[in-house]
From Swiss-Prot:
Domain of life per record: Bacteria
Family named by the database record: Belongs to the UPF0047 family.
Protein name: UPF0047 protein Mb2586c
Lineage: Bacteria, Bacillati, Actinomycetota, Actinomycetes, Mycobacteriales
PANTHER family noted in UniProt: UNCHARACTERIZED PROTEIN YJBQ-RELATED (PTHR30615), UPF0047 PROTEIN C4A8.02C (PTHR30615:SF8)
Amino acid sequence: MLDVDTARRRIVDLTDAVRAFCTAHDDGLCNVFVPHATAGVAIIETGAGSDEDLVDTLVRLLPRDDRYRHAHGSYGHGADHLLPAFVAPSVTVPVSGGQPLLGTWQSIVLVDLNQDNPRRSVRLSFVEG
């Protein structure tokens, strides 16, 4: 289980941690899962503006205001609970020879727009095969 600080970042790159986890395995599937109702996991390009573009797009799609029936927590918190409908809580990546088979520009990231929860858990699991 990874413990991730999201207090200052909305997108956190998990790729290095996933690569390190996969080195203990050979061939199979690595699943990256966030057991939270207001966060997700994505495979995107980072460092070229795509991560900021994703956050900007999600903020436009899910504005923090009083339109939501789910109204506990901070103002607009209902939007946070809709995030996993757009960014799933898990991704599965094929692994060969202990290496995740990601494309050149692909990174595995935690997406968390909910500033009420500054710590997240991320579960890594592996299915041999």
